[in-house]
A protein has these predicted regions:
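Structured adenosyl-cofactor binding patch, chiefly the S-adenosyl-L-methionine
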Residues: 103-142
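Strongly charged, low-complexity linkers/loops
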Residues: 73-87
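Short, acidic/turn-prone active-site loops that include or flank metal/cofactor-
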Residues: 76, 98-99, 121-124
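RNA substrate-binding interface of SAM-dependent RNA methyltransferases
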Residues: 1-68
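Short coil/turn segments at beta-strand junctions that form active-site/ligand-binding loops
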Residues: 65-71, 89-91
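A C-terminal functional module that forms or caps the active site or interfaces directly
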Residues: 90-107
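Conserved beta-strand scaffold positions in the cores of enzyme catalytic domains, especially
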Residues: 50, 69-71, 114-118
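Short beta-strand segments
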Residues: 16, 72-73, 94-95
């Protein structure tokens, strides 16, 4: 995922762990190397900033920006990203783990003004959902 989102021009990624996450550690140095190689390959002038992994609760507690905010999850009735999209200079999108966000995590995100969205009718792996969400936002911005 790091390689692909770096190629398409994402500025920053923060890994979060949730109730259903399988991993609570990442190899930051390995991800940095992948990002740099991808940046060089794609002739990008900006380096992807990769943040340390933190809990969703910590992320939401410390989150205070004017970004357009979305949380992608599997609940029926969520609008597609392209229907919910509002142009802004920066975006934050939360992508859940393979087991999705818990209902409490979704509620906590809503309290921080994250809007629930869908990335489509198919169930996607986290890596695929991340790439699709980032690419979709970049395309909707242009």
């Amino acid at each position: 995922m790091i390689e692909k989102i770096s190629e398409i021009g994402v500025d920053k990624v923060t890994f979060i762990y949730t109730q259903h996450s399988e991993r609570r550690k990442i190899k930051l140095d390995r991800l940095e190397k992948i990002s740099i190689a991808s940046m060089k390959q794609s002739n990008s002038l900006k380096k992807l900033k990769i943040e340390e992994i933190i809990s969703l609760q910590s992320f939401l507690r410390n989150y205070n920006t004017n970004d357009e905010k979305y949380i992608a999850h599997m609940n029926e009735g969520n609008e597609l990203l392209k229907k919910s999209f509002k142009k802004n200079e920066s975006f934050t999108i939360l992508i859940g783990p393979e087991g999705d966000f818990s209902s409490n995590e979704i509620t906590d995100a809503h309290k921080k003004k994250f809007k629930s969205i869908s990335l489509g009718k198919n169930t996607l792996k986290t890596e695929t959902a991340s790439i699709i969400a980032c690419y979709s936002i970049i395309q909707l911005m242009s």
